[in-house]
Amino acid sequence: MIYVSLTTIPERIKDSNRSIDSLLNQSLKPDKIFINIPLKYKRFKEVIDDEQIPEFNDNKVEITRCEDCGPGTKLLGSLDKLERNSLIILADDDNIYENYMIEKFYHYYSLAPENAYSFYVHPLGNFGIGQGADGFAINTNSLDGIKKFYDKVVKDYKELFLYDDLWI
């Protein structure tokens, strides 16, 4: 399975269809696109009502109402719906993606599924931190324990809560 997962916030919901359309128009189609929308936000007073969510005439798009985990909602909101040994690509709601994004990620994933991939990686010593805005791809098998890690370490640590690139 190939999943794409993202989240949105109140100020960006009305324009999120541009990003979703770019994901639906990929040369290699995803099996499912999750849009994870918190029922209420920790960072904003506003909420997104169901009526504000754009309709997508494609059964590949699934809206998931969930807890606000900051930008990490893009992953954690759909985590329990993912099959093992699948590719998940994390995306942002304010980017329009090149139509080859999924195809490129899948190509490299098929060569080495134990690795994570991003189109831009920040070097940090002997490590690299993938920038999620450009897309971040990982095997779902690598996500064991990430929700527990979020609950124990990230949830109450503002700097991590707001910067999912550091902990996903």
Question: Regions from the language model: what does each represent?
Answer:
Residues 19-31, 39-40, 54-55:
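Short, acidic, metal-binding catalytic loop of nucleotide-sugar glycosyltransferases
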